[in-house]
Curated annotation (Swiss-Prot):
InterPro entries: Amidohydro_3 (IPR013108), Metal-dep_hydrolase_composite (IPR011059), Metal_Hydrolase (IPR032466), Metallo-dep_Hydrolase (IPR051781), PhnM (IPR012696). It comes from the Bacteria. GO terms for molecular function: hydrolase activity, acting on carbon-nitrogen (but not peptide) bonds. This is Alpha-D-ribose 1-methylphosphonate 5-triphosphate diphosphatase. CDD domains: PhnM. Its EC number is 3.6.1.63. It is an enzyme of class 3 (hydrolase). GO terms for biological process: organic phosphonate catabolic process. Belongs to the metallo-dependent hydrolases superfamily. The keyword Disulfide bond does not apply. Catalyzes the hydrolysis of alpha-D-ribose 1-methylphosphonate triphosphate (RPnTP) to form alpha-D-ribose 1-methylphosphonate phosphate (PRPn) and diphosphate. It catalyses: alpha-D-ribose 1-methylphosphonate 5-triphosphate + H2O = alpha-D-ribose 1-methylphosphonate 5-phosphate + diphosphate + H(+). Keywords: Hydrolase.
Amino acid sequence: MIINNVKLVLENEVVSGSLEVQNGEIRAFAESQSRLPEAMDGEGGWLLPGLIELHTDNLDKFFTPRPKVDWPAHSAMSSHDALMVASGITTVLDAVAIGDVRDGGDRLENLEKMINAIEETQKRGVNRAEHRLHLRCELPHHTTLPLFEKLVQREPVTLVSLMDHSPGQRQFANREKYREYYQGKYSLTDAQMQQYEEEQLALAARWSQPNRESIAALCRARKIALASHDDATHAHVAESHQLGSVIAEFPTTFEAAEASRKHGMNVLMGAPNIVRGGSHSGNVAASELAQLGLLDILSSDYYPASLLDAAFRVADDQSNRFTLPQAVKLVTKNPAQALNLQDRGVIGEGKRADLVLAHRKDNHIHIDHVWRQGKRVF
C-alpha cells in the first residue's frame, strides 16, 4: 500500500510526500510523490502515527450505559473499540478500577466482565485497535490488594496506577469541590454526604499506605510500568519516585509536575483539560504546564475524541513552544516510550504501520482513515 500526497508528521518536522506500507510495517517514506497508479491519494492531509492512549475509562460507559443497565459484553466491547479507532487511537490501555470509592458501585460488578472481554477479543483478533489493561488501584479499599494480586497475572496488564480519591488531599484538596462532585454523582443528602465523607477518611487511614507499598512492590517484581495519580506535593512525588513510578498521572499542582519531571517521570495530563481550557476539579491546567515545558503525555481520559484535537490545540497555542511534531509526540512517541513499546509511536522505517490520516476543516480535525499494522480499520 502506498499513501500519496500527504503531510508526513515526523519526529522533528513535517514534510510533504508519500509513504509505503508492506507486511504491516512502514517500508519507506519520501519527500516525493509516487507515480504508481494504485497509490492512494491522501488529498494533502496530515499523516500521523496511530495515537496511543494510556488512560481511558470509556469502556465503563458501554457496559453500563445507564444506571442499573447491564449491556452484553461483546456488544459493549465492539462499540468501545469502534469509538477508539474513530478517534485515531490504535493502541489503547483500557483503565479498569480495582476497588471503588463507594460500595455497591458498578465498577466492581463490571470488573471481571470487562477484563474478560478485553482478553477474549484480543485473542480472537476481532478488535480494530490493540487493547491492553491499565489497572487503576483505588487504595482506600479493603478489596483492592486481594483483587490486584489476582488480576496482575493477566496477560494484557501493561500499566498500574495508584489512586486515592479520599477528601482533603490530591485531586480533592478542596473539600467543597469533593462534596460538590460526589454529592451530585451519587445524589446524596447533606447528612448522607457527611457520613460518606467520614467513611472515606477512615478507609484511607486504614488502607491507603499499606496497599500503596504492596502494589508497587508487586509491579517492580513483575516489571510492570507504574503511575502515580493526582500527586499534589513534593512529598507525594518523592514517594512515587521511590516506589518506582515512571508516569505522573494528572499532577494537581505546578510544584508536583515540576518535581515529577526532576525525578525523571513523564507528566501525563488530560486532553479534555486542553480542549475545555482547564481542569474540571479546579487544579492546575494542562495548558499552563505546556507553557512551562512540563507536559509529556496527553490522555483522552473520559472523552476519546479529545486526544487528537488536543494535540493540534497545543501546537496552535502561541503561549507555548510546541511545534506540531512535538505536540503529536504527546499522543504517540512519548506514551510508547513510557511503556517501552519500541515498535510504534513514530513514522519510521520498520515501525508498525499504525497510521492516522486527518484533514483540518474550519479549525477542526477530521479523521479520514486509520490503519493498524497496515490494515485499514476506519
